């Protein structure tokens, strides 16, 4: 499976996902500011991968840093805030940064060289854990799919959005290994086209049957009886089950409910925000108008037209059939169940 990022010679090599599917381009980041720019610019995307990338970037900030004492504490806080400001909706980012801060606090008395080594090791741990977690999500979720399943998805919740294997696409991969998948319907996912550029490319590489749809074809496809389940990823899940995911997810959930199709969310426990009670509290990132006005530099509309471009929407819990995580399947009523799962995941 393709590597999204890897650490070598005190530099982070990242796969620039903006270049896919036309080119496979790795970029070398030698400074934390370059990693920040890569996250903001969507060269790296997907909630789990954003978190791990930020962890590596934070570790990189201490490679060669010789400060000690209070100056080092101030430097750590500044670097952490730099990464925390990149993508406000993806809670995995803050979870990973908290993991890194815990390691820093436990080891800040050590030499600069040893502290840097331990921070890098924690980032590596996060990377390996994410792959294991995604494989577990896949195994749990495939149980929900029968033979000949036709599954619809949006955005990219696959290996490209994680450190490997994927969440929603992890479920599809695990089901495909058991010959359960007849077709994956991939919504193109305007405005950045993660579905057409990334999900289709991933599934094509794995020889999993896939058909591309424009986003506004989803409802009609469901009405024809061609969809057995909808599976999406998540960027943040509130403790009542309300879920933030790529813009367009809410529309799919409404359509699935109307047509009597199960709607599943696949996400690790690190995507749950234990401090948020319901979806209205989740911050929704708004991105550049140019993402909507243009595609690959070509203008699609009046160049100065006003644009509303939220990157995510909120799917209320009553539209979700079940949430698939690494420990198992969470079913309604979500509030009580999520609290139990949260305690078990501590």
UniProtKB/Swiss-Prot annotation:
Site described as Transition state stabilizer, located at: 155
Q: Name one Pfam family in it.
A: IF-2B
MF terms from GO for this chain are: S-methyl-5-thioribose-1-phosphate isomerase activity
Q: Does the keyword Membrane apply?
A: no
Q: Extract the coiled-coil ranges from the record.
A: none
- Reaction(s) catalysed by this chain's protein: 5-(methylsulfanyl)-alpha-D-ribose 1-phosphate = 5-(methylsulfanyl)-D-ribulose 1-phosphate
Q: InterPro entries under this entry?
A: IF-2B-related, IF-M1Pi, IF_2B-like_C, Initiation_fac_2B_a/b/d, M1Pi_N, NagB/RpiA_transferase-like
Sequence positions that bind substrate: 45-47, 87, 194, 245-246
Q: In which pathway does it act?
A: Amino-acid biosynthesis; L-methionine biosynthesis via salvage pathway; L-methionine from S-methyl-5-thio-alpha-D-ribose 1-phosphate: step 1/6
Provide the alphabetized UniProt keywords. Amino-acid biosynthesis, Isomerase, Methionine biosynthesis
Q: Name one GO biological process term.
A: L-methionine salvage from methylthioadenosine
What Enzyme Commission number(s) does the record list for this chain? Answer: 5.3.1.23
Whether Nuclease counts among this entry's keywords is: no
Q: Where is the active site?
A: 235
**Per its UniProt entry, what is the enzyme's top EC class, as one word?**
isomerase
What HAMAP family does this protein's entry cite? Salvage_MtnA
Family according to the record: Belongs to the eIF-2B alpha/beta/delta subunits family. MtnA subfamily.
| Job description of the protein | Catalyzes the interconversion of methylthioribose-1-phosphate (MTR-1-P) into methylthioribulose-1-phosphate (MTRu-1-P).
- Write the protein's name: Methylthioribose-1-phosphate isomerase
Instruction: Provide the species name.
Output: Syntrophomonas wolfei subsp. wolfei (strain DSM 2245B / Goettingen)
Its gene is mtnA
């Amino acid at each position: 499976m393709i590597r999204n990022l890897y650490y070598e010679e005190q530099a982070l090599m990242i796969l620039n996902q903006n270049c896919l599917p036309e080119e496979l381009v790795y970029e070398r980041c030698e400074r934390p500011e370059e990693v920040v720019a890569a996250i903001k610019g969507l060269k790296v995307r997907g909630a789990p991968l954003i978190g791990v990338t930020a962890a590596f970037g934070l570790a990189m900030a201490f490679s060669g840093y010789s400060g000690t004492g209070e100056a080092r504490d101030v430097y750590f806080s500044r670097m952490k805030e730099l990464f925390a400001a990149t993508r406000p909706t993806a809670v995995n980012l803050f979870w990973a940064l908290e993991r890194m801060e815990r390691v820093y606090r436990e080891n800040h008395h050590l030499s600069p060289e040893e502290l840097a080594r331990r921070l890098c090791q924690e980032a590596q741990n996060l990377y390996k854990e994410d792959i294991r977690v995604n494989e577990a999500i896949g195994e749990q979720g495939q149980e929900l799919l029968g033979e000949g399943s036709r599954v619809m998805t949006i955005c990219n919740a696959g290996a490209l959005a994680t450190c490997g294997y994927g969440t929603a696409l992890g479920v599809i991969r695990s089901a495909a290994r058991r010959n359960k998948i007849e077709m994956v319907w991939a919504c193109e996912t305007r405005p950045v086209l993660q579905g057409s550029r990334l999900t289709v490319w991933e599934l094509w590489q794995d020889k999993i049957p896939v058909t591309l749809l424009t986003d506004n074809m989803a409802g009609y496809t469901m009405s024809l009886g061609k969809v057995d389940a909808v599976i999406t990823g998540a960027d943040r899940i509130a403790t009542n089950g309300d879920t933030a995911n790529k813009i367009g997810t809410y529309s799919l959930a409404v359509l699935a409910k109307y047509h009597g199709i199960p709607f599943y969310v696949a996400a690790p426990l690190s995507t749950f925000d234990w401090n948020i009670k319901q979806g209205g509290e989740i911050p929704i990132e708004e991105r550049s108008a140019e993402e909507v006005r243009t595609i690959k530099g070509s203008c699609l509309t009046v160049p100065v037209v006003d644009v509303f471009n939220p990157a995510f929407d909120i799917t209320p819990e009553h539209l979700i059939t079940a949430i698939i995580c690494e420990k198992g399947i969470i079913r309604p009523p979500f509030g009580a169940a999520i609290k139990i799962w949260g305690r078990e995941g501590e």
